Amino acid sequence: MPKVSRKTASQKIEMDGLEVRLEHMQGGYSVCFESHKADANLSPLFKGLPDDRCDLPRWGYVLKGKTSFQFADHEEVYEEGDAYYVPPGHIPVHHGGAEIIEFSPTAVLGATMGVVMKNIEKGAS
């Protein structure tokens, strides 16, 4: 698929306070269009990954609001208009009202989401 928009993305994921439109692109990358409806620290969802942190590298752009990522020794905050790269080893923190676009390697995204979904099934939120 050579291009995608929020409206044309083939997958939709909704969880408490989060809506994601997702498309797997050619070249081994996926794009996520995210709307954060509520504040949320997602720490419990990454239990079982290395250091119980997200191991997904992310390249993103903040369309509206802000998003942040907690590392073992610091926190990074990105606000409207910021482009960013976040390496593996973080915890995403959602801020209500934020809208972001992120790109990640499809294979790593799939493996990470497998762990996240198992944790959700076990009652993590």
Residue spans of the language-model regions?
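Short, conserved beta-strand element in jelly-roll/cupin
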Residues: 51-69
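Short acidic-glycine-tyrosine-enriched beta hairpin
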Residues: 71-90
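Ligand-binding loop in jelly-roll beta-barrel domains
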Residues: 88-113
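Glycine- and charge-enriched low-complexity intrinsically disordered segments
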Residues: 114-125
